[in-house]
């Protein structure tokens, strides 16, 4: 449930307060669960209005377009009413059993990404005028002076980054 683009987690107590106060469905997107140190998946039985979404996209399998929802059966029944028929292509259907058999490999891959994320974050923090924000995802948000110039310089080095300059006033620079 870390968010994009900051990569940070909301305090569990804040999410719990929303779950207790909301009269309807609360969706927690855990697309980055493989990199986060927290999850609400184990709380689905505790909160009947909680639906957790997950995907394999963030662990290097975006092309499969495979995600899933975990919730009380009544919510899944409602989703099934609007779900398109044949919503998984044949390739994805063939790969799913292989993925399930390779959970250790996926966990190792996520661990490597977390390790490299830590190295990148530390290196960015050592650069002058760069602020790298804590993250629980597979990316690092950093504030740099003159972001368009940094973006172009990195692109010329063959390094592609997402330039968020101008997206929101709090993301300027």
Please provide the spans of the model-predicted regions.
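Short glycine/proline-enriched coil/turn segments at helix->beta-strand junctions
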Residues: 20-25, 46-48, 101, 127-129, ...
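PLP-dependent aminotransferase class I/II
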Residues: 49-126, 130-133
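Active-site pre-lysine segment of PLP-dependent enzymes
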Residues: 5-59
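Conserved C-terminal alpha-helix-loop-beta "cap" of PLP-dependent enzymes
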Residues: 125-131, 139-173
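Short, well-ordered alpha-helical scaffold segment located
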Residues: 39, 74-75, 146
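A general structural detector for well-ordered alpha-helical segments in enzyme core domains, enriched
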Residues: 14-18, 120, 150
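Short beta-strands and strand-loop turn motifs
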Residues: 1-3, 28, 133-135
């Amino acid at each position: 449930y870390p968010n994009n683009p900051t990569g940070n987690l909301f305090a569990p107590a804040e999410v719990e307060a929303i779950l207790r106060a909301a009269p309807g469905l609360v969706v927690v997107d855990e697309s980055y669960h493989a990199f986060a140190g927290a999850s609400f998946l184990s709380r689905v039985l505790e909160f009947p209005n909680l639906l957790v979404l997950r995907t394999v996209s963030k662990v290097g399998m975006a092309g499969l377009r495979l995600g899933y929802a975990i919730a009380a059966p009544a919510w899944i029944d409602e989703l099934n009413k609007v779900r398109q028929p044949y919503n998984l292509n044949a390739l994805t259907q063939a790969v799913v059993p292989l993925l399930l058999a390779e959970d250790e490999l996926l966990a190792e891959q996520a661990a490597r990404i977390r390790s490299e994320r830590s190295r990148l974050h530390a290196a960015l923090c050592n650069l002058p005028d760069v602020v790298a924000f804590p993250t629980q995802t597979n990316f690092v948000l950093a504030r740099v002076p003159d972001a368009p110039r940094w973006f172009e310089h990195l692109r010329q080095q063959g390094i592609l980054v997402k330039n968020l300059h101008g997206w929101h006033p709090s993301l300027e620079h």
